[in-house]
Amino acid sequence: MPASPAAQLPAASLLQLIWLASPALPVGGFSYSEGLETAVERAGVTTEVLAGDWLRDQLHLSLARGDLAVIAQAIPAWRVGDVQRIRELNDWVLQTRETSEMRAQAEQMGRSLLDWLRNHDGANAQHITACAQMQPTYPVAFALAASQTAAGVRDCLLAYAFGWAENAMQAALKSVPLGQSAGQRMLARLASDIPTAVEAAISLPDDERQAFSPMLAILSSQHETQYSRLFRS
C-alpha cells in the first residue's frame, strides 16, 4: 500500500540522502576494504558465500553497534547545536579505531566530506567550523551532512548503511575476486539485513555502543605490511 503523503520523505531530502550514499561522492570510500583484503589472503574468504557472510557480520557486529549508533546520536545533536555532545561522539570514534589504517580512514573520509560540505549550497557555516575544529571522523561528518536534510534519523542511517554496503561489495569483487552478478546477490543479502541493523543502532544507549572486533583489528594490522594490496585498509 503506498505511503500517505504525510509519511513520505520530501523529494529534496530523499535526493540528498541518495547523494550522500552514492559511491560517486568524493570521499574516497572505494579505496578501503576495512580488513577484507587481508581476510581474503589470510582467513580463507575466497567465495561469494564466505565474502557475503563476512560483510554481513561486519554490518551487524561492527557497523550497527558502532558507527551507525554514533550517527543516530549525532544527527539530533547537530540539529540542536550541541557541539559538546558531538565532540564526545567524535572522540569515541577516534578512540575505538584500533589500528593506524582504521583511524586514517575515519579521518580522511571525514575531512573529505567536510570539504565537500563547504562547497555545498545550504551548508551551515557555523557547524562546519565547529566540526573542522575537532578532527572530524566520517560518521560525525556524515551526521552533520544528514542533519541538514529534512530526513528522519532512520532514513539517514539506511542511506549510510547502504552506501557502506555498496563500497564493501565492490571491495569484495576486487579482492576475492568475484563477478558482477555475485556482487548483486551479496548486495541483496546486505540490503535485506540493513533495516534490522539500523533499528539495533537506534536503540543503543551510550553505555552499550561498542567497537570490539579483535580479529578485525588483527587483520587490519596485518594489512599494513601486506606485500600485495589494492586497498588502503
UniProtKB/Swiss-Prot annotation:
Keywords from the UniProt entry: Chaperone, Cytoplasm, Nickel insertion
GO molecular function, one term: nickel cation binding
Subcellular location: Cytoplasm
Gene3D superfamilies in the record: Urease accessory protein UreF
Main localization (coarse): cytoplasm
Pfam family, one: UreF
Keyword Cytoplasm carried by entry: yes
Regions crossing the membrane: none
Entries under InterPro entries matching the protein: UreF, UreF_sf
Subunit annotation: UreD, UreF and UreG form a complex that acts as a GTP-hydrolysis-dependent molecular chaperone, activating the urease apoprotein by helping to assemble the nickel containing metallocenter of UreC. The UreE protein probably delivers the nickel.
Protein role: Required for maturation of urease via the functional incorporation of the urease nickel metallocenter.
Family the UniProt entry places it in: Belongs to the UreF family.
Protein name per the record: Urease accessory protein UreF
Gene for this chain: ureF
